[in-house]
């Protein structure tokens, strides 16, 4: 089919990342080079705050044994006993000679082993990335630097904003100098043209304003679509991971004055507020009820009245916020501003879980006299696996008629068996609704007509019957309006579908057509697509896992599925991210690795205007790399049970094939996740490899993302079984390598990774892994939330054996490990401390004591409260050093042994 009108030819649409890298054959590594930045970073900083994370500081390694050169040698750090009585000189000579012979024999055996053709499992397609070229001359990174953000690249967010008259390429900038305005809208192209007639629109001149003597300092801002009023949030307080409350204000651009969103209740905290597409009203939720404020009046209209502790309107409860929408809003305006769709959530039947706070007062209330010594308890409606779920239904508000209504859909799921995962407005009063059954393996897509108040299911997909898998909740479907002049006769939408065992993009038109045009045939899996849609030129932009699963590249495709073209340079193994302007004529391109990240604003290939501006080059980070020595990264595959699994091996600087290195396995491993990627990242694993001198291995095993649904879905109903087998088999492969000390192999993970660490050492029983570390682990999936757990495990009532197998329960096997460590925050609202406490109780009942535990008072799942983040990593590092130094090697005969041979061994620094 011919290209759409206005589309550039394929020859003109060349990759936009040409010459961003150069190769040096001498080290087989990539070295980044680019031009100098030309933009002040202040005006591009994230509209709602910086993305630069900070963390706590490092603690020292302590006063331990050192090698002759003054450096603590952890590459061969066996346990060294301290002390011992003097031995007579002759005995020293004789025993020294005997020990020399023994050591010589051991060395000969080692050499024969090393060069004797020792077999290991085959690996393929090995890729070596080394981002530092200082050799042995560079400084060592410290844990302090890793935790305080010293090694974090500077990243900035551009907030694209649609123009009042359909203009494309407009930026919302915050934090500019007073002379240019605190908040303004600027045309991207005019930034580099001082003679441009398109001048910036200043929305807020100052960084604060006063209302009746109260100074208002914005924490978040949302301009109205017509850019005449700004919705402002101040006094923000965090609720859960994504939700917050605060005071909301309306700021008039022309007069530069503000007023409360609700003048009659200006001090009451609001949970959510959003603009009408007409710019004439704001809908908001307060105390779980919805209200409407029209700008033409100071009065506030009540939309709902019965919201409260158990009934939510327009905002999600805990489990929907965490597991379905990853955000604080379930409110959607129709494009014409005539209707509002929202979820009503009834969690009356959901059991409560108490989260206790022993140090802090999260509710902000002072205890009553005499009750100061009692912990504060916050009760959460938390549906665990198999427990009653919240009842959620979709409702609508007719703005003109001031009326709330709902629409029944014939053949839909029962209330207790329904998850509403996406709502997308189409045109002419139609709305597309995606829902699944409770176990997320049957999908319904319905189209509702709010004008006629009717609805029908237009797509049904049984994912369990298709491949035994599930469907993940997502909010990426994109409505495509009809445009006969450009060949689109009907409305439609773009969605992610399962095609030939992978997630692909598909175009459904008209909206009730169940048979789509698959847009991305033959490509690797798409990632949160589509990323951008150019309606004018008939193009869809998407991010895809590239030639290898650890890559990310950007492509475009026509609406008819023809002419798939790369936007980034796919000849380089790279990791990109992107955000597109509203018309997709411009893109904010982020190169995230493997070399030093950079960011640019560019015109897209089909745009007639050519534009490129560098936003960030991270020159500070590049200079730092020239002074430090980092680990080398080896990307490869291993074959286990017929599956090709991605692996990242981090090797210490000055890696020596003839040495024996301890190995730390690091994993997350959750369904659909990915840990092996090409992002630039100097993290705790980098510290372990580059400073402590250990090898770190990460395996994305079965169940993880971007290696095909066959490998992903095999884990269903039996979490931890295949994933732990993959880690164990990988550890056996590494244990057989000549440069690995098979007696010093450990594994660690956080959250799902904590579960995986425990499940792996449980299944292995000390045969391969000797140590393990689990932070905030799930230990029994009956304790985790229903929406996440049942997606992968079904319900406990349906699959009791699977839940039994997945629980960490084989204490006999755990006792066969040398030692393991468990750490958890006591106020974890996500993975409850119940998991670790019941697990430790099992250990106590079965007289297992080869473990350590550390609880962090009042810390949630991220473990930050009162210096906890620093402690969790420093404790992890110290514990790992102690483990690999043999601190906890079992002594089967603890009776004192004063033999001459033992004392001689102590004298020469050996352990018997």
UniProtKB/Swiss-Prot annotation:
Q: Which molecular function terms from Gene Ontology are attached?
A: aminopeptidase activity; dipeptidyl-peptidase activity; serine-type endopeptidase activity
**What residue spans carry the Basic and acidic residues bias annotation?**
1-25
Q: Where is the active site?
A: 751 (charge relay system), 828 (charge relay system), 861 (charge relay system)
Q: Check the record and name the InterPro entries matching this protein.
A: AB_hydrolase_fold, Pept_S9_AS, Peptidase_S9_cat, Peptidase_S9B_N, Serine_Prot_S9B/DPPIV
Give membrane topology per the record: Single-pass type II membrane protein
Q: Where is this region: Disordered?
A: 1-31, 49-70
Q: Which Gene3D superfamilies match?
A: alpha/beta hydrolase, Dipeptidylpeptidase IV, N-terminal domain
- EC number(s) for this protein? 3.4.14.5
Name the residues that span the membrane.
93-113
| GO BP term, example | proteolysis
**Which of the residues are on side Vacuolar?**
114-912
User: What does the entry list under GO cellular component?
Assistant: plasma membrane; vacuolar membrane
Q: Which keywords belong to this entry? A: Aminopeptidase, Glycoprotein, Hydrolase, Membrane, Protease, Serine protease, Signal-anchor, Transmembrane, Transmembrane helix, Vacuole
Where it sits in the cell: the answer is: Vacuole membrane
- Reaction(s) catalysed (UniProt annotation): Release of an N-terminal dipeptide, Xaa-Yaa-|-Zaa-, from a polypeptide, preferentially when Yaa is Pro, provided Zaa is neither Pro nor hydroxyproline
Q: Give the Cytoplasmic membrane side ranges.
A: 1-92
Query: Which Pfam families would you find in this protein's record?
Result: DPPIV_N, Peptidase_S9
Q: According to the record, which residues are glycosylated?
A: 130, 210, 346, 569, 656, 810, 897
Q: What does this protein do?
A: Type IV dipeptidyl-peptidase which removes N-terminal dipeptides sequentially from polypeptides having unsubstituted N-termini provided that the penultimate residue is proline.
| Stated family | Belongs to the peptidase S9B family.
Please identify the protein, giving its name as recorded: Probable dipeptidyl-aminopeptidase B
